[in-house]
UniProtKB/Swiss-Prot annotation:
The lineage of its organism: Bacteria, Bacillati, Bacillota, Bacilli, Lactobacillales. ATP binds at residues 29-32, 86-90, 413, 478-480, 494. Pfam families: Cpn60_TCP1. The gene is groEL. Together with its co-chaperonin GroES, plays an essential role in assisting protein folding. The GroEL-GroES system forms a nano-cage that allows encapsulation of the non-native substrate proteins and provides a physical environment optimized to promote and accelerate protein folding. This is Chaperonin GroEL. The keyword ATP-binding applies. It comes from Lactobacillus gasseri (strain ATCC 33323 / DSM 20243 / BCRC 14619 / CIP 102991 / JCM 1131 / KCTC 3163 / NCIMB 11718 / NCTC 13722 / AM63).
Length: 543
């Protein structure tokens, strides 16, 4: 396909137009008085949201050159969301501020490469200062504050704090849509996986249609059990001890399943069989997790172990097991704390090393099941549109809270970035005049989020920023109440990781845009070059 190429000033001007179109749309949502944006869908009612990354992803511009500028800013927002889970609008505002100021200087004759060096120097100094002024999250109230600010709802903040208290900081917290209008929290203790009993005749509670086993032995294997003789010696020993048994296997079929069911119905002993969770390598890993949690051994050919040779001390144990038709929950596994802790560290390392979002999600699920259980926040609302909007906000709040637990928090409302600017301004020097220009560009951009928050609240952003520059650290403008106060004491805080990621990604994308000298895009199709329309077959030939 034919290409259009633009060079130097023309190229940068087109990219800047795209940057402005996307940023001007997204930045209206920043702060407590931020507005909503309505997004058209191909069918059904439009979405209404104030989530920066959702808006950024939905924007495609007609002009190819402008669209590339917009997509680069969208990447800064997306990357911030991937790393920290929030801060997408802040990243967009910072990118626009650095690009705009940088373009002015490049147009005036400054060297873009020198400016880029200055931007990188100033960003590193700002990030170091952010870490110095960061507070550690230590209490449930602080967790609730972070979540409340991100979601603009005290109710949601308290829900997330409750969830984290119950499942721990490494626990999985999932967000689901509720069928009612209330938003509520439920917690699944212990390890749960989505495999139910192989026969309904194994249930112990006919009203709830579930099987409850107290202090059972747990046989864990990746083999298929078809012949009851393979496990008969083991079953006889369990019957003699008067214990119940949970079998987790690749499958239980042939004569084995009806024999187990018959013994259960006769009251010989209590047994429930379920299929092993997951598939392939993930199944092996999950079986090993269950074995470590319960203090058992996976009976597998990979380890040279056979079912017929299995001893009772190779079985796992748990305080309680509940099996429904869809799920199995193991509570109070008897595994050693040291072995579980070692396994948790191993999974954390795998999470840090993986590049796949899907693998990361599955590893985090495994981590949570070992580390403390699963909490489910069920989001309710009166309409589907409101439900989607609330779900977006709660997801953002949850991500922001995790980020705060990881790296701490700083004063919110853009105050921390201005505090950083006040601390390092004058101390950070570029290695050339152009590099110093780059440093100054970042210093000026650090005030952009505060200006935008104030403007969205109907105030003069320049006046608010000027006032803030002469205030003590952590004193900021609370746009929600129109007051000047200590932001940390007022509970207006941002996760350090979110602020840091927003600044680093904005600086990275802005530096790339400023050093762009040529832009190549698909040329628009010319109507004249299109094939002529086929003749109407109904028209006859004149004779």
């Amino acid at each position: 396909m034919a290409k259009d190429i633009k060079f130097s000033e023309n190229a940068r001007r087109s990219l800047l137009k795209g940057v402005d179109k996307l940023a001007d749309t997204v930045k209206t949502t920043l702060g407590p008085k931020g507005r909503n944006v309505v997004l058209e869908k191909s069918y059904g009612a439009p979405d209404i949201t104030n989530d920066g990354v959702t808006i950024a992803k939905s924007i495609d511009l007609k002009d190819h050159f402008e669209n590339m500028g917009a997509k680069l800013v969208s990447e800064a927002a997306q990357k911030t969301n991937d790393i920290a889970g929030d801060g997408t609008t802040t990243a967009t505002v910072l990118t626009q501020a650095i690009v705009r100021e940088g373009m002015k200087n490049v147009t005036a004759g400054a060297n873009p490469v020198g400016i880029r060096r200055g931007i990188e120097t100033a960003t590193k100094a700002a990030v170091d200062e952010l870490h110095k002024i960061s507070h550690k999250v230590s209490t449930k109230d602080e967790i609730a504050q972070v979540a409340s600010v991100s979601s603009a709802s005290t109710e949601v903040g308290n829900l997330i704090a409750d969830a984290m208290e119950k499942v721990g900081h490494d626990g999985v917290i999932t967000i689901e849509e509720s069928k009612g209008i209330d938003t509520e929290l439920s917690v699944v203790e212990g390890m749960q996986f989505d495999r139910g009993y192989l026969s309904q005749y194994m249930v112990t509670d006919n009203d709830k249609m579930e099987a409850d086993l107290d202090n059972p032995y747990i046989l864990i294997t990746d083999k298929k059990i078809s012949n009851i003789q393979d496990i008969l010696p083991l079953l006889q020993e369990i019957v003699q001890q008067g214990k119940s048994l949970l079998i987790i296997a690749d499958d239980v079929d042939g004569e084995a399943l009806p024999t187990l069911v018959l013994n259960k119905i006769r009251g010989t002993f209590n047994v429930v069989a379920v299929k092993a969770p997951g598939f392939g390598d993930r199944r092996k890993a999950m079986l090993e997790d269950i074995a470590i949690l319960t203090g058992g051994t996976v009976i597998s050919s990979d380890l040279g172990l056979e079912l017929k040779d299995t001893k009772i001390d190779q079985l796992g144990k748990a305080g309680k097991v509940t099996v429904t038709k869809d799920s199995t929950t193991i509570v109070e596994g008897a595994g050693s704390k040291d072995a579980i802790s070692e396994r948790v560290d191993q999974i954390k390392k795998q999470i840090a090393d993986t590049t796949s979002d899907f693998d990361r999600e599955k590893l985090q699920e495994r981590l949570a099941k070992l580390a403390g259980g699963v909490a489910v926040i069920k989001v309710g609302a009166a309409t589907e549109t409101e439900l989607k909007e609330r779900k977006y906000r709660i997801e953002d709040a949850l991500n922001a809270t995790r980020a705060a637990v990881e790296e701490g928090y700083v004063a919110g409302g853009g105050t921390a970035l201005v505090d950083v600017m006040k601390s390092i301004q004058g101390n950070v020097k570029g290695d050339s005049q152009d590099a110093q220009t780059g440093v100054n560009i970042v210093m000026k951009a650090l005030g952009a989020p505060v200006r935008q928050i104030a403007e969205n609240a109907g105030k003069d952003g320049a006046v608010i920023l000027d006032h803030l520059e002469h205030e003590d650290p952590e004193i900021g403008y609370n746009a929600a109440t129109d007051k000047w106060e200590n932001m940390v004491k007022a509970g207006i805080i941002d996760p350090t990781k979110v602020t840091r990621s927003a600044l680093q990604n904005a600086a990275s994308i802005a530096a790339l845009l400023l050093t762009t000298e040529a832009v190549v895009a698909d040329a628009p199709e010319d109507d004249k070059n299109q094939a002529p329309a086929a003749p109407n077959p109904g028209m006859g030939m004149g004779m």
